[in-house]
């Protein structure tokens, strides 16, 4: 029998990379949560970091709350009720994400994890993501003096209803797929330059790229590069296909579109966006989604003109400034 309250359940704290069993437990929980919510509870980059552990660029803290059987060893054979992950930068700023198994919601699991985190690390320099605009997350954030500081919209279009213009590439520019073992350095350079003011994307490393290329979803055919007549990479559209998950059908994603600064303003970004969407349409997917910051008015306007509508949103919370 499981004790009635999370207060009595053990919180396991791991500094650095997590072991194989805990990673499996976390993945199983995330699969159940995504089936229930239709949204991932933890970002892809955080999962990559959990596998890799600490590095010169960040440190990792994971708190796992287990619901043990009454007579079992707390270290084995229990259900993972929820977990919290903090990815911290060298300056002690960090981002918190929490996932709770659907079977253990509305029992105080997230609050137990947050209080354990408060005791272990405190909240200095910490912001938190809620993937999906959940009322429970908003209530929990307010309880600890946090309020929304950023909205990341999820926008979606139904491919059957899409009537897209042709992708008009600038003169002398052509598209080709990414070639593993050849294009990594060129892509990293363009990505870094294109997202110089967007640290989450622009700071991706060779190791980060390699980790994504090892994921089951990676397909170089859907990783489109725009090159000039001399073969120089000017931009890219990396698409992604989320496979069918339970009752949720497969869906395409405009994963990331980037254009080198010297090619910006030429219409290449729009052409790349259209080319990637067309690629996903041709796969027979029923819909295509993307993420964009709510306050990025030019991007939101472009996507709306292409037929995207707001579907859901992720909310980042930060401490309320007094005064």
Swiss-Prot record:
Q: Which family does it belong to?
A: Belongs to the acetyltransferase family. MshD subfamily.
For this UniProt record, give its keywords in alphabetical order, as a comma-separated list.
Answer: Acyltransferase, Repeat, Transferase
Q: Where would one find the signal peptide in this protein?
A: none
Keyword Cell inner membrane listed? The answer is no
Under Enzyme Commission nomenclature, its number is 2.3.1.189
Q: Which GO terms describe its biological process?
A: mycothiol biosynthetic process
Residues bound to acetyl-CoA 1 are: 98-100
Q: Enumerate the InterPro entries for this protein.
A: Acyl_CoA_acyltransferase (IPR016181), GNAT_dom (IPR000182), MshD_Acetyltransferase (IPR050276), Mycothiol_AcTrfase (IPR017813)
Write the protein's name.
Mycothiol acetyltransferase
Q: Which organism is it from?
A: Pseudarthrobacter chlorophenolicus (strain ATCC 700700 / DSM 12829 / CIP 107037 / JCM 12360 / KCTC 9906 / NCIMB 13794 / A6)
Give all residue intervals belonging to the N-acetyltransferase domain. Answer: 77-176, 173-323
This protein's record includes keyword Repeat: yes
| Function description | Catalyzes the transfer of acetyl from acetyl-CoA to desacetylmycothiol (Cys-GlcN-Ins) to form mycothiol.
Q: Which residues bind 1D-myo-inositol 2-(L-cysteinylamino)-2-deoxy-alpha-D-glucopyranoside?
A: 44, 200, 240, 253, 291
The residues listed in the UniProt record as binding acetyl-CoA 2, with positions renumbered to this chain, are: 257-259, 264-270
Q: Which PANTHER family match?
A: L-AMINO ACID N-ACETYLTRANSFERASE, MYCOTHIOL ACETYLTRANSFERASE
**Subunit comment for this entry?**
Monomer.
Q: Which Pfam families does UniProt cross-reference here?
A: Acetyltransf_1, Acetyltransf_7
Any one GO MF term held by the record is: protein-N-terminal-alanine acetyltransferase activity
Q: List the catalysed reactions.
A: 1D-myo-inositol 2-(L-cysteinylamino)-2-deoxy-alpha-D-glucopyranoside + acetyl-CoA = mycothiol + CoA + H(+)
């Amino acid at each position: 029998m499981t004790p009635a309250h999370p207060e009595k359940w053990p919180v396991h704290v791991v500094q650095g990379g997590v072991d194989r069993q805990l990673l499996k437990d976390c993945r199983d929980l995330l699969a159940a949560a995504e089936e229930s919510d239709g949204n991932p509870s933890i970002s892809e980059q955080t999962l990559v970091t959990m596998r890799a552990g600490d590095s010169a660029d960040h440190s990792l803290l994971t708190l796992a709350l287990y619901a043990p059987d009454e007579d079992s060893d707390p270290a084995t054979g229990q259900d993972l009720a929820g977990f919290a992950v903090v990815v911290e930068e060298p300056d002690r700023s960090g981002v918190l994400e929490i996932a709770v198994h659907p079977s253990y919601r509305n029992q105080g699991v997230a609050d137990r994890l947050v209080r354990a985190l408060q005791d272990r690390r405190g909240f200095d320099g910490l912001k938190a993501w809620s993937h999906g605009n959940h009322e429970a997350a908003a209530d929990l954030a307010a309880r600890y003096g946090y309020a929304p500081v950023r909205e990341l919209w999820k926008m979606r279009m139904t491919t059957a209803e899409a009537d897209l213009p042709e992708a008009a590439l600038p003169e002398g520019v052509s598209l080709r797929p990414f070639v593993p073992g050849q294009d990594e350095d060129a892509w990293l350079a363009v990505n870094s330059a294109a997202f110089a003011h967007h640290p989450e994307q622009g700071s991706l490393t060779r190791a980060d790229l390699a980790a994504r290329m090892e994921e089951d979803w990676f397909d170089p055919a859907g990783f489109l590069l725009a090159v000039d007549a001399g073969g120089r990479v000017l931009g890219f559209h990396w698409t992604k296909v989320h496979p069918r998950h339970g009752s949720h059908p497969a869906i395409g994603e405009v994963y990331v579109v980037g254009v080198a600064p010297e090619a910006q303003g030429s219409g290449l970004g729009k052409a790349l966006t259209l080319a990637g969407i067309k690629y996903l349409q041709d796969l027979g997917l029923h819909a295509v989604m993307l993420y964009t910051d709510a306050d990025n008015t030019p991007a939101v306007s472009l996507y709306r003109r292409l037929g995207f509508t707001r579907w859901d949103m992720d909310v980042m919370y930060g401490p309320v400034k007094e005064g």
